[in-house]
Design a protein with these regions (language model features):
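C-terminal segment of N-terminal export signals and the immediately downstream linker at the start
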Residues: 7-8, 25-61
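Hydrophobic/aromatic-lined pockets within catalytic cores
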Residues: 18, 22-25, 61, 123, ...
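Residues marking the start of alpha-helices
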Residues: 4, 41, 102-105
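Mature-region segments of soluble proteins
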Residues: 52-55, 69-172
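N-terminal secretory signal peptides and thylakoid transit peptides that target proteins
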Residues: 2-24
């Protein structure tokens, strides 16, 4: 009797089992979201480093209703020749800290509280501060994210908040 060869379809691969945290490496130089609705090319960082950076961004500014693609766009700016060494070294330190607590690496640390613990231990480091401060503008300046928070954008060009309804927000 011939044994049936086990196969893995593209759909099965993309639907989940290969994910690392919120993002996973799909090939040399590429990172994709666990939903496979987005992917990004990396040129100066390792794809695994970018996947970990995306998870780190999500842990620093957690929003369940914000998709991974926005976090990926927020950290894409670190994929430069000038910052590659600092990012690779910082992520290696993050992974080492996770391994010191018994996890395979930071991105594969299953519980958010364990990842946040690791981040709290390094929150005063220049690496953490660089990522955290860059995320403030990298994440929240994306116009596509604004509606997710109920922000309608600036009002000056439309007559200001007084003429536009300065008290129409429903999230406070």
């Amino acid at each position: 009797m011939l044994k049936q060869k086990a196969t893995l379809t593209r759909r099965q691969l993309l639907s989940g089992s290969a994910s690392i945290g919120t993002a996973f490496v799909i090939g040399i130089g590429y990172v994709a979201g666990s939903s496979a609705a987005w992917a990004m090319e990396v040129t100066h960082l390792k794809p695994q480093t970018m996947a970990t950076l995306i998870q780190m961004a999500r842990d620093i500014y957690p929003h369940d209703h914000v998709a991974d693609e926005f976090y990926a766009a927020a950290v894409k700016g670190y994929d430069t020749e000038e910052q590659a060494d600092m990012i690779e070294t910082g992520i290696a330190g993050l992974d080492a800290a996770a391994q010191g607590k018994g996890f395979a690496n930071y991105a594969e640390t299953g519980w958010e509280r364990h990842r946040v613990d690791i981040l709290r231990n390094m929150e005063n480091s220049p690496f953490f501060q660089t990522i955290r401060s860059g995320l403030v503008t990298g994440l929240y300046n994306q116009k596509a994210v604004w509606p997710l928070f109920g922000y309608e954008g600036e009002s000056y060009s439309q007559g200001g908040y007084i003429d536009r309804g300065f008290d129409d927000i429903n999230w406070i």
